[in-house]
Amino acid sequence: MTALQALYREDFDHGRAIRLWLYVVAALVFAMVLVGGATRLTESGLSITEWQPVTGALPPLNEAQWQMEFQKYQAIPQYRQLNAGMSLADFKTIYWWEWTHRLIGRVIGVVFFVPFVWFLWRGWVPPNRRAGLWMILALGALQGAIGWWMVASGLADRVEVSQYRLATHLVLACLIYVAVVWTGTRWEDERVQPLLGKLYRTAQTMTVRAGAIGLMLLLLAQIYLGALVAGLRAGHAYNTWPLIDGGLVPQSSQLFFEVPLWRNFFENPLTVQFDHRMLGYAIGLLALLQLFNVVKLVKHGPVFASVLLVVAAVIVQVALGIWTLLSVAALPLALLHQATAMITLTFSVIHAAITIPPKVSARTEPSLQ
């Protein structure tokens, strides 16, 4: 083995270690989103009424501490208006959901920060990659603050958190997830990076690239709408399909009665659910169009495989969405619907990441496969 080959092998091993680290972080973010969904659906998110990033890592350890936490919860409107008479045992159930959600957030911070500092110290992170990783770390810190900002909205004058803040919290989590998966997928040397290949500058390939990015962005928008649906409990109304409020398209007087007009898109349960349905149909059509465009270029290889996964996931997700609606947002189906949304987003990120080739150097010739 030559010195150059040994150096390349060492760099490749470093890259493999960093990719593994990023995929572990992504798995933890995925888990946190699901636990966050369960916390929301079980209405557990207001059970911890304080934000203590360090000392809050420990749960109540004795009966006196549990009673103290319960008394804090009893002082907020949600308890007085919705859960008056709740037993301590029932309170513990909702408390553990929220505590677990926050604990995973703390674990993510440690799992990201400690190896990141180690990789930097060892010189394993190329200079052109560092800014992206620092940005992910900054977004993670911001997410903790936004999580408390969301919880705080339900502690004084409401019995639930603001749907605006809930949607912001979820979408930022998804943006962090996208950034981590994207970075891990593309953390490869040009010689092993899967590409569309020599056609990457043609109109057809640029169409595929645009379609991949478009799908990913629409899925993020759909997740935002899904959060509004959850925040407004819109999944507990208009539980028919394909009709909604008695028609394929509701009457405009019902869709747009809020003033000013823009509020309907965020505060009117009918409008929010209708938008969520329509965007789901649009994503399904775009996924099929993307498959058609990819097949015109390649019929095997990573790009083809990834678009098949996207299409399959979208179809399953649409079916699950309908089933969840008809079940009046039954908890197991609602959680499965959220999990499948994250899986669909994962496939779309991978598909987009491998359709965009790295810079081509003189030593590198992209492969169509």
Residue ranges and their predicted role:
Residues 1-369:
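Polytopic transmembrane helical bundles with strong interfacial aromatic enrichment
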